[in-house]
Regions:
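Conserved SAM/AdoMet-binding glycine-rich loop
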Residues: 1-82, 93
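Conserved, mostly hydrophobic/aromatic
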Residues: 3, 31, 72, 92, ...
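Flexible glycine/acidic-rich beta-alpha junction loops that bind and position SAM and/or redox cofactors
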Residues: 10-14, 33-44, 75-82, 98-124, ...
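Short beta-alpha junctions and helix-cap segments that line functional grooves
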Residues: 15-16, 88, 180-181
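Short, hinge-like loop/turn segments at secondary-structure boundaries
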Residues: 19-20, 88, 118-121
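A glycine- and small/hydrophobic-rich beta-loop-beta segment
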Residues: 85-95
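Terminal RNA-binding accessory module
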Residues: 113-213
Length: 213
């Protein structure tokens, strides 16, 4: 079972305790933050602060120590100052996300933000801030993947690699993409894989054995 996404306010200790207790629930949580600045979060009407969000991250680490965490981040929301942008970067350093979905703010007519606030951040500033967020996330993703080298992971093989029909691609229970040599393995197999190499987006490994689940 793979958890999809949750508003941080719904990520209670009770939910995390249950997720950590059952082996058939994946070690992966998508917990959107949007911004690392409490003042920006207030303007977004997100109903939580930076501190409250980080408390939920700490709870995830407590109940699910090996859990991979992803998020959504928006650069250049209405009125965002450079200091508020730096708060987002510092939150990223504190959490060290495995994956992030990153965008710059684009006004949508009819939304609360469009009604209440002016889209006043110049596009070149939005793009520069987004580039800084992406660069930091790329560093963190590579860091998280390097931590996996030498470990053994259970991988569900999902499809043939685009670059070679002699490779298969699967995912760990932490939602990390793993590439293996096809050999006698088939799509749909669960296999134990020793991770040997990585990029910031992909793990590579050798199959040790097939797993029957």
């Amino acid at each position: 079972v793979r958890f999809s996404t949750s508003h941080p306010k719904d990520m209670s200790d009770d939910v995390l305790e249950v997720m950590g207790r059952y082996a058939n629930i994946c070690n992966y949580i998508h917990l959107p933050v949007q911004s690392g600045s409490s003042s920006v979060l207030d303007r977004m009407n997100r109903t939580y602060s930076r501190e409250w969000y980080l408390n939920r991250i700490a709870a995830i680490r407590k109940y699910m120590p090996n859990c991979a965490i992803s998020s959504d981040i928006i650069a250049g929301f209405c009125g965002e100052t450079e200091a508020e942008h730096q708060e987002t970067l510092s939150l990223m350093d504190e959490v060290v996300y495995d994956l992030n979905y990153m965008f710059f703010y684009s006004e949508r007519p009819g939304t609360l933000a469009a009604k209440k606030f002016e889209d006043d951040i110049p596009e070149d500033v939005k793009k520069r801030r987004l580039e800084e967020i992406i660069a930091k996330q790329n560093q963190h993703a590579l860091q998280r993947h390097k931590e996996q080298i030498g470990t053994k992971q259970i991988v569900l093989l999902e499809y043939t690699a685009r670059r070679s029909d002699q490779q298969l691609v699967g995912r760990t229970d932490g939602n990390k993409k793993v590439v293996i040599t096809k050999d006698e393995w088939n799509i749909g197999d669960y296999v134990e894989v020793e991770i040997t190499d990585c990029t910031q987006v992909t793990l590579f490994g050798n199959v040790i054995r097939k797993i029957d689940l």
